[in-house]
UniProtKB/Swiss-Prot annotation:
It catalyses: 5-methylsulfanyl-2,3-dioxopentyl phosphate + H2O = 1,2-dihydroxy-5-(methylsulfanyl)pent-1-en-3-one + phosphate. Bifunctional enzyme that catalyzes the enolization of 2,3-diketo-5-methylthiopentyl-1-phosphate (DK-MTP-1-P) into the intermediate 2-hydroxy-3-keto-5-methylthiopentenyl-1-phosphate (HK-MTPenyl-1-P), which is then dephosphorylated to form the acireductone 1,2-dihydroxy-3-keto-5-methylthiopentene (DHK-MTPene). It comes from the Bacteria. One of its GO terms (biological process) is L-methionine salvage from methylthioadenosine. Its cofactor is Mg(2+). Keywords: Amino-acid biosynthesis, Hydrolase, Magnesium, Metal-binding, Methionine biosynthesis. Belongs to the HAD-like hydrolase superfamily. MasA/MtnC family. This is Enolase-phosphatase E1. Monomer.
Length: 232
């Protein structure tokens, strides 16, 4: 019996374009000014970590901004970039400049699954702060109260490694066989299954990642009949 459902975001609950155009675009436009404004407080560890990772110990804030923008454009999963993006976008969510965008079937499905007793969690490459803001500031009504746990690359590990899913199961205190993972990435589904989870692929029109065997694939959360099975 499935007791917990773990959700990917990009391509699964939300359009990839919305995540990258909204969050990435907002971050890219504000990086230089934000780094300069917060160089002595919130940005200080980000500046230091970026200089170390890039091998540029003497880089000024403008050069660090260029490095972070290059990483953003290449979708590099670097911790200082994720931290900067989380802090910058948090300001955007707080002011109403940003909202979480979801496929139309997602909010009602999440509410139904939650009402039926399923525990809902998120596992994404986005920072924990961005994840929470994305759901809390969902367009059309907040969804954050439905989510009981968030995991990212720092707290769980790489999404294509089985060990990451074992760590999530341990953190949740749930047996692997009671966990269901929903993602649009076949390699991530492979890793979840290798860790003993159930996994279902989500392939939506216009999304870039193709489905492949041996996984079951759906085009909408409506195709999962989990809400009819209350969890004891």
């Amino acid at each position: 019996m499935t007791t917990a459902i773990v959700l990917d975001i990009e391509g699964t609950t939300s359009p990839t374009g919305a995540v990258r155009e909204d969050l990435y675009g907002y971050t890219r436009a504000r990086l230089p000014e934000w780094l300069a404004r917060h160089r002595d407080d919130a940005a200080a560890p980000i500046l230091a970590a970026t200089r170390e990772l890039a091998g540029r110990p003497d880089a000024d804030t403008d050069e660090v901004a260029r490095i972070l923008r290059e990483w953003l454009g290449s979708d590099v999963k670097a911790e200082p970039l994720k931290e900067a993006q989380g802090l910058i976008c948090h300001e955007g969510f707080a002011t109403g400049a940003l909202h979480g965008e979801f496929f139309p079937d997602v909010p009602p499905a999440l509410r139904a699954w939650h009402a039926a007793g399923h525990r809902l969690c998120v596992y994404s490459s986005g920072s924990l702060r961005n994840q929470r803001d994305w759901f809390a500031h969902a367009r059309g009504g907040e969804l954050g109260s439905l989510i009981s746990a968030h995991f990212d690359l720092t707290t769980a590990g790489p999404k294509r490694e089985a060990g990451s899913y074992r760590r999530i199961a341990e953190a949740l205190g749930v047996e692997a066989g009671q966990l269901l993972f929903l993602s649009d990435h076949a390699d991530e589904l492979d890793a979840a299954v290798a860790a003993g989870w159930s996994a279902v692929g989500v392939h939506r029109p216009g999304e870039p990642n193709p489905p492949r065997p041996p996984h079951r694939w759906i085009g909408s959360f409506d195709e999962l009949d989990l809400a009819r099975t209350p969890v004891s």
